[in-house]
A protein has these predicted regions:
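Active-site neighborhoods and metal-handling regions in enzymes and metal-associated proteins
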Residues: 1-393
Length: 393
């Protein structure tokens, strides 16, 4: 397998910034303030695990034209200098008071004046990564500035993956698919669930993954009840059904899919649930092409799984049947009955139907796909219709 080029050409970041600036111009927005890890990385290439420390705020200001301006703690200067920026301002952080707020205010005023328009990410699936009290101080210092939401514009730009992004996504999904394919070779009855998780991470790293930053799942007789839990030391027993759902990273891009298995044998209800989920995914694949909506995907899967219900959005549901993916584990859109986002060429999405069965059991399957002009390309190796059974020789 040929490994894609790490990082991006300068033109990639220039194109991303240009698209955002075109959207800013339409709303007469003088600058866009970015504070989250994903948005800062998307527009500058600033990639570091140092974001796991909540101590320091990091700011990037995208002006109406030109390269982004970084306003960051001095500890990040050297790395940020290697990124796609036109200017860098820094301060010693953490500060006893005024942790970058006055400096940020100055830079914003340089770009939009005292009464311009400042774009921010305010909508669904966003957050402002700075103390609320500092945000309030910033708003008070910029009392004549109009704060406007640019969530829809930025998310639309990020939804469409460039050819370089697509190669990274295809690569990470191929590696993880191969690890899942090998899983029955090193999994056995009696293995504690936490040891299985640990072994999976080791196999993924040995196969070329940069990090296994997300790995959840469950196991139990005939099935599992929880799909987001960390592992326990429960040994896998004959008749257990288990699931691993993983988000693995390669050069900052995620895979996000799961696989189900049974040990030695499985009850017919578990086998039936797995087949229904496969059929629901197949129904979605049959209509998947540019021009449909995320809601269309929801409804076609829901009709397969719950033919007698008008909507999946009940108290015992997970709320959606898949989502976008990329530099974050999950990204817009959401395959729900209300999301009218148009599926477009270049999107990377998951299909993730789920079903309840038996006595409080649940099962979920997930595939990763890339949307192309005439339909889709599977990035994950398609799960089988029949529930894989380990040790039934």
């Amino acid at each position: 397998m040929i490994e894609p080029h790490r990082g991006f050409e300068t033109s990639e970041f220039a194109n991303r910034c240009s698209k955002a600036q075109q959207a800013m111009t339409k709303s007469d927005i003088g600058a866009l303030l970015l504070t989250s890890e994903a948005d800062v990385r998307y527009f500058t290439g600033f990639m570091t695990q140092f974001w796991q420390s909540p101590t320091r705020p990091w700011f990037v200001l995208l002006p109406a034209s030109g390269k982004p301006i970084a306003v960051i703690p001095s500890i990040g200067e050297q790395l940020m200098k290697s990124c796609y920026i036109g200017d860098l301002r820094s301060w010693a952080s953490p500060a006893e008071s005024d942790d970058g707020v006055t400096l940020l205010t100055t830079v914003i005023r340089e770009q939009i004046g005292h009464s311009g328009k400042l774009g921010m990410m305010m909508g669904r699936e966003t957050s402002i990564r700075m103390p609320l009290v500092d945000l309030q101080t910033l708003q008070n210092l910029l009392e004549n500035v109009e704060f406007l939401d640019m969530t829809a514009d930025v998310q639309k730009i990020r939804m469409i993956k460039s050819p370089a992004e697509q190669k990274k996504l295809m690569h990470v999904c191929k590696i993880v698919s191969d690890v899942f394919t090998s899983l029955p070779e090193w999994t056995f009855a009696g293995m504690p669930l936490n040891e299985l998780f640990r072994r999976f991470k080791i196999k993924a790293l040995e196969s070329g993954i940069d990090d296994v930053s997300y790995l959840v799942g469950g196991a139990g007789p005939n099935g599992y009840q929880d799909i987001i839990a960390p592992p326990n030391n429960h040994p896998l027993l004959n008749g257990d059904v288990f699931m691993l759902d993983t988000g693995c990273l390669w050069d900052g891009y995620f895979s996000d899919f799961n696989r189900n298995f049974a040990i030695h044998h499985a009850h017919d209800t578990a086998k039936d649930a797995h087949q229904k989920l496969f059929d629901a995914t197949e129904a979605a694949l049959e209509i998947l092409k540019p021009g449909i909506t995320a809601a269309d995907l929801f409804f076609v899967m829901d009709r397969e799984l719950r033919p007698n219900q008008s909507s999946q959005n009940t108290g015992d549901s997970v709320g959606r049947y898949g989502h976008g993916m990329g530099i974050q584990l999950t990204e817009p859109p959401s395959h729900t009955d209300w999301d009218q986002t148009i599926i477009e060429t270049g999107m990377a999405i998951t299909l993730e139907p789920s079903i309840n069965y038996g006595d409080g059991l649940t099962m979920v399957t997930e595939e990763n796909l890339l949307i192309v002009d005439d339909g889709f390309v599977l990035m994950s190796t398609r799960a089988s219709r029949n529930l894989p059974i380990i040790g039934n020789l």
